[in-house]
Amino acid sequence: MIAVDTNILVYSHRRDSEFHPAGAAKVRELAEGRALWALPWPCLHEFFSIVTHPRIYDPPSRVDQALGQIDAWLETASAVLLAEGETYWPRLRDLLADGKISGPAVHDARIAALCLTHGVQALWTADRDFTRFPRLRTVNPLI
């Protein structure tokens, strides 16, 4: 199963992004395919926060547009939501301790822990910060 990071979701949604064509095509490929693909809850939260933020985008996506986009992804038959469960904390704790993770990097550790807990084969991301988590395979689908 492939999970999709925040930046790829943002690129797929924001037509003004230079990476929109590739990002939209890749997410559409997952959404229209039969194979299960994953959306970590933190990535959806971050997506909403980023695309509706007026200091990041001018104009930002309207709330109804961002909510509609999330709804569309969640309505695909092959989408799986990655949420915290009983085994999440031990996994996150190990990642934090082993990688000496603190500060803002904790947000990436949360996503990594969710992916590892749910058996994700690869996280699609354009963010190199995930290399801090060697147990998580990352792929940049834009290159």
Regions found by a protein language model. Give the residues of each.
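Short beta-strand segments at enzyme active-site cores
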Residues: 38-42, 125
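Short, well-structured N-terminal submotif of metal-dependent ribonuclease cores
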Residues: 1-39, 54-68
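Active-site neighborhoods of divalent-metal-dependent phosphate/nucleic-acid chemistry enzymes
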Residues: 60, 78-122
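Acidic, PIN/NYN-like endoribonuclease modules and their adjacent C-terminal/linker elements
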Residues: 1, 112-143
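Short, conserved active-site loop motifs that form the nucleotide-linked donor/cofactor pocket
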Residues: 35, 79-80, 136
